[in-house]
């Protein structure tokens, strides 16, 4: 078992918590972050809203039936990005091995840390305290020998808690771990596992590598390692991007049409980034990740720059239409990005 010390930090109901911080009169009420509209989906739900069954990626229409008294606030991605930058500034006091997964979560490798703190649990405790002191927001943390285990552990004491999974306890922990807790195991995969008599990671561990390959394709190889607590992926420090992008990991695997419901707010977020960086783009890329971790991308390149957010959204929707429908496919991530960047006003042609 690895001797690394990995922390997974996950902010608690991040978007909703930022909105509640800005509008404290809403505290205690079910708050939903979403644009209102017939085809809109929830970006985030406060813990009070979750008690009514509301969650991100749910349609606003469904949410209003389940919780008519919920308060809806539009997302403010520029603000979320500012707060995320504050949080990352806290991380950098301890390590430069930081791998952001989104605005509200990241992996940190603190095996060697700037403060020479021997216990990763103490590092996590200090980081969470600093985040709260400087932003007023709470975070949960998982501490483990690798990224897979740290991510699972961060969910164990939510909200505003942390859970340590030391190497000598990993196998016992995994023996009874429900399969639905394994990242990437969504409804489709879980149903197949259950049909094979699997209920826990311990059950899955009793299958040979070849059997898992037959049942789950190449994802079977990864499952074989994960249920044995093996994950050698390093924490990859963020590097300068050659494109600008935004994406969302869905709380459950969704069919393509439902996943595409996130495109309007992704496009709006991405357009804000483009505007703030004072650049223009000539290509748009759609990224999808399936339940079994296959990556699907589609790209459109134009002879001139995108003129506005509506054109960006239109391009993303055209790319969705290029994804061949597969009845078994369910998606756990959707994102869009732009490339072929040029400084604003350098490209004068009209978009066509």
Swiss-Prot record:
Active site: residue positions: 105
UniProt keywords, alphabetically: Cytoplasm, DNA damage, DNA repair, DNA replication, DNA-binding, DNA-directed DNA polymerase, Magnesium, Metal-binding, Mutator protein, Nucleotidyltransferase, Transferase
Needed co-factor(s): Mg(2+)
Protein name: DNA polymerase IV
Subunit: Monomer.
Record-linked CDD domains: PolY_Pol_IV_kappa
GO biological process: DNA-templated DNA replication; error-prone translesion synthesis; SOS response
